[in-house]
Amino acid sequence: MIVGGDGAINDAINGIMTSMVEDKTNIAFGIIPNGIGNDFAKYWGLDEDNYKAAVDWIINRRLRKIDVGRCNYFDGEKHTSRYFLNAIYIGLGARIVQISDGTRRFWGIRELSFAASMFLLLFERKLYRTHLCINGEHIRGRIMTVCVGSARGYGLTPSAVPYNGWLDVSVIYRPELIQLFSGVWMLLQGRILNHKMVKPY
């Protein structure tokens, strides 16, 4: 049972996946949203303002098998890995998530917090040299951010479904300033994939 937000869910899923239990497919966990970020819970229609709905899910054993992603990376000292349920970000997206997690209490709304964080980083539009291989397609060059999601996360992979066996990927190239403003607006409307500087996979 997880009572908390996305951070608590992330810690729990990593605890489960790194445990000594051989058959992890039979492990069930319940979520009662009670954190700054409850993005994954909200995908299922659960909200911290209505904890009774989450309790009803658990009592009635409403089960759904979900996808778990794994990210292998080098942390500067050693190669390691982390598991995730929602989304991971590379580049500027990771910085935005870092800031928005700190401002969520002030803004209250996840999309608004994310958008506000983007505004705070308007002039940090740093590009990252990358080599991506997605579905056999090699992408080399400088990009602003990459989002890999099994669910919608902060809205950069809005079409992702956490139980279809697929990961959605959004590659975001560096937009001009006016395009960044329109991108924030499209993010809030759930239409970010229509932005010409975003390439979805």
Task: Give a label for each model feature.
Residues D11-I13, A41-K42, R95, T157, ...:
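Short glycine-/acidic-enriched loop or helix-start segments at secondary-structure transitions
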Residues I96-T103, L167-E176:
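Compositionally biased, charge-rich terminal segments
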Residues M1-T25:
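N-terminal small/polar loop signature for handling phosphorylated ligands or for N-terminal nucleophile
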Residues T145-Y154, A160, G190-N194:
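Phosphate-binding core of ATP-grasp and ATP-grasp-like enzymes
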Residues L92-R95, A151-L156, E176-Q179:
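Short, acidic Gly/Pro/Ser/Thr-rich loop/turn segments
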Residues C133-R140, V161-N164, V171-Y201:
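ATP/nucleoside-binding phosphotransfer catalytic cores, i.e., glycine-rich phosphate-binding loops
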Residues G4-G5, I32, Y173:
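Small/polar loops that bind or transfer phosphate-bearing groups
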Residues M17-C147:
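Catalytic core of DAGKc-family lipid kinases
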